[in-house]
């Protein structure tokens, strides 16, 4: 018995102990990853800023239509109006206007346009400076520097107007496709224009240093040179002539010894059966200027096309009793201290040109030397008016043809010098232009153009409406008003 009991005790000592290990439960992976939350980079909501792209269509409109497209709470674009209703401030920073023509190939005229940031001008006052041809598509893009100079605009005030005026007929001209970008913001969030948060009182500040004296800026000195010309039609020199439509002339602009070719808006002050008085516009920036002009008028007529293209074929004489060259105020300009001298040289009675002798008061040359003080409160224009082109056969000294043909007529040589008047400016670095020696007499300032200018609505834009030619000769029409369709009174009357 004792032996058996001892053997069982030894077996228990040799038997190993069992160890129980409890493994932690494994979490099952998600079958789908969580979608990251997207955030609006431009911002949204009623208490933040927002940027919106908008687009609209305006039209169609006729070739002689005038119109105003407003941008702001008065806009016809529902996207602009809807967003302005939810925000307190806004600014339109980019605009593109595309003109889509629907006119026929035979339509004449152009569409003039202008961005009015004052929101006070009328479409009828738009001058023919920036234009699209009625028959061709066109586009214009405007940045923040043109659309307005204020950081933000109240949502109840218009930022600018897009004005347009057509010089065509009553047929459909086309329509506009307009797109742009508007930034919106509430008064509680000012973005980059926010005032700094108040900090601790820094204590008394030292007095600021005196501002440095301004560096003198060189005064501008520039001008225009060239021989303006337009188109006319004539046949035999014992028949009357007529003029073609006129919308611009080409001149050379010089400044700081740099020369460029520019196109300046032009038209007729008066265009009837008797005569046509041409003029062109000279742009002026804001400021005060001294202007000096020399004109040597000679209405040389040149051939167009054929074997004698560009050759001189005669001249159109002046009427000595009519006005000569004149500088006149246009929009936003005032002329003063006007001094001028004019000279008209008659043709000798024994002189013959194309088998025609000169009758009394038939001028061959019309000259002008003048100076005046020009003041402009904003970017604007003034005009230089040429002597009237006489249409009667008594002034026709052009080589005879069997039928009416188109030719070019020169107005004469024109030289314009413009000197900026600036009290703090240094002397202009270039003053080397020669001037004629003449005693200028103080004369009355010529009357300004009527508001909106005088563009040739009746005769200058549609050939079918002007005094023209037929198989039997020159068509005779009753006299037309001297001025525009609004029948404003002529200041020359």
UniProtKB/Swiss-Prot annotation:
<feature type="region of interest" description="Disordered">
    <location>
        <begin position="445"/>
        <end position="493"/>
    </location>
</feature>
<feature type="region of interest" description="Disordered">
    <location>
        <begin position="189"/>
        <end position="218"/>
    </location>
</feature>
<feature type="compositionally biased region" description="Pro residues">
    <location>
        <begin position="195"/>
        <end position="215"/>
    </location>
</feature>
<feature type="compositionally biased region" description="Basic residues">
    <location>
        <begin position="1"/>
        <end position="18"/>
    </location>
</feature>
<dbReference type="InterPro" id="IPR002929">
    <property type="entry name" value="PLrV_ORF5"/>
</dbReference>
<keyword id="KW-0946">Virion</keyword>
<feature type="compositionally biased region" description="Basic and acidic residues">
    <location>
        <begin position="484"/>
        <end position="493"/>
    </location>
</feature>
<dbReference type="Pfam" id="PF00894">
    <property type="entry name" value="Luteo_coat"/>
</dbReference>
<feature type="region of interest" description="Readthrough domain (RTD)">
    <location>
        <begin position="191"/>
        <end position="493"/>
    </location>
</feature>
<comment type="similarity">
    <text>Belongs to the luteoviruses readthrough protein family.</text>
</comment>
<dbReference type="Pfam" id="PF01690">
    <property type="entry name" value="PLRV_ORF5"/>
</dbReference>
<dbReference type="GO" id="GO:0005198">
    <property type="term" value="F:structural molecule activity"/>
</dbReference>
<keyword id="KW-0167">Capsid protein</keyword>
<feature type="compositionally biased region" description="Basic residues">
    <location>
        <begin position="32"/>
        <end position="42"/>
    </location>
</feature>
<protein>
    <recommendedName>
        <fullName>Minor capsid protein P3-RTD</fullName>
    </recommendedName>
</protein>
<feature type="region of interest" description="Disordered">
    <location>
        <begin position="1"/>
        <end position="50"/>
    </location>
</feature>
<comment type="function">
    <text>Minor component of the viral capsid involved in aphid transmission. The RTD domain of the protein is exposed on the surface of the particle and determines the vector specificity and tropism of the virus. The RTD domain is not necessary for virus stability in the host hemolymph.</text>
</comment>
<dbReference type="InterPro" id="IPR001517">
    <property type="entry name" value="Luteo_coat"/>
</dbReference>
<dbReference type="InterPro" id="IPR029053">
    <property type="entry name" value="Viral_coat"/>
</dbReference>
<dbReference type="GO" id="GO:0019028">
    <property type="term" value="C:viral capsid"/>
</dbReference>
């Amino acid at each position: 018995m004792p032996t058996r009991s001892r053997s069982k005790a030894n077996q228990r000592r040799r038997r190993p102990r069992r160890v129980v290990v409890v493994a932690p439960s494994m979490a099952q992976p998600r079958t789908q990853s969580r979608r990251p939350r997207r955030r609006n980079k431009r911002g949204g909501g009623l208490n933040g800023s927002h940027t919106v792209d908008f687009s609209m269509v305006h039209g169609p409109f006729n070739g002689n239509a005038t119109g105003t497209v407003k941008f702001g709470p008065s806009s016809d674009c529902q996207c602009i109006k809807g967003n302005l209703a939810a925000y307190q401030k806004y600014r339109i920073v980019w605009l593109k206007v595309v003109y889509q023509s629907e006119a026929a190939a035979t339509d004449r005229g152009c569409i003039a346009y202008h961005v009015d940031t004052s929101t006070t001008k009328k479409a009828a006052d738009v001058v023919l400076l920036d234009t699209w041809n009625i028959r061709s598509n066109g586009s214009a893009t405007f940045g923040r520097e043109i659309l307005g100079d204020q950081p933000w605009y109240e949502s109840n005030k218009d930022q600018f107007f897009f004005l347009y005026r057509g010089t065509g007929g009553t047929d459909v001209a086309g329509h506009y496709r307009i797109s742009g970008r508007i930034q919106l913001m509430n008064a509680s969030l000012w973005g980059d224009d926010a005032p700094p948060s108040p900090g601790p009182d820094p204590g008394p500040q030292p007095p600021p240093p005196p501002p440095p004296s301004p560096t003198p800026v060189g005064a501008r000195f520039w001008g225009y040179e060239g021989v303006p010309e337009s188109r006319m039609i004539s046949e035999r020199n014992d028949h009357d002539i007529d003029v073609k439509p006129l919308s611009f002339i080409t001149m050379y602009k010089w400044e700081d010894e740099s020369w460029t070719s520019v196109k300046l808006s032009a038209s007729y002050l008066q265009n009837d059966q008797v005569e046509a008085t041409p003029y062109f516009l000279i742009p002026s920036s804001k400021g005060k200027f001294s202007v000096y002009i020399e004109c040597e008028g000679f209405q040389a007529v040149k051939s167009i096309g054929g074997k004698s293209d560009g050759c001189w074929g005669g001249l159109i004489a002046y009427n000595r009793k009519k006005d000569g060259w004149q500088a006149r105020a246009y929009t936003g300009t005032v002329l003063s201290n006007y001094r001028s001298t004019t000279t008209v040289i008659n043709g000798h009675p024994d002189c013959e040109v194309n088998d025609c002798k000169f009758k009394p008061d038939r001028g061959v040359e019309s000259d002008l030397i003048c100076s005046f003080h020009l003041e402009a409160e904003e970017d604007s224009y003034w005009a230089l008016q040429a002597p009237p082109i006489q249409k009667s056969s008594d002034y026709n000294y052009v080589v005879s043809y069997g039928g009416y043909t188109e030719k070019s007529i020169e107005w004469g040589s024109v030289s314009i010098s413009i000197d900026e008047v600036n009290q703090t400016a240094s002397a202009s670095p270039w003053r080397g232009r020669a001037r004629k020696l003449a005693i200028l007499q103080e004369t009355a300032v010529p009357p300004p153009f009527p508001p909106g200018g005088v563009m040739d609505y009746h005769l200058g834009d549609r050939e079918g409406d002007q005094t023209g030619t037929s198989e039997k000769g020159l068509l005779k029409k009753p006299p037309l008003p001297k001025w525009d369709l609004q029948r404003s009174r002529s200041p020359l009357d």
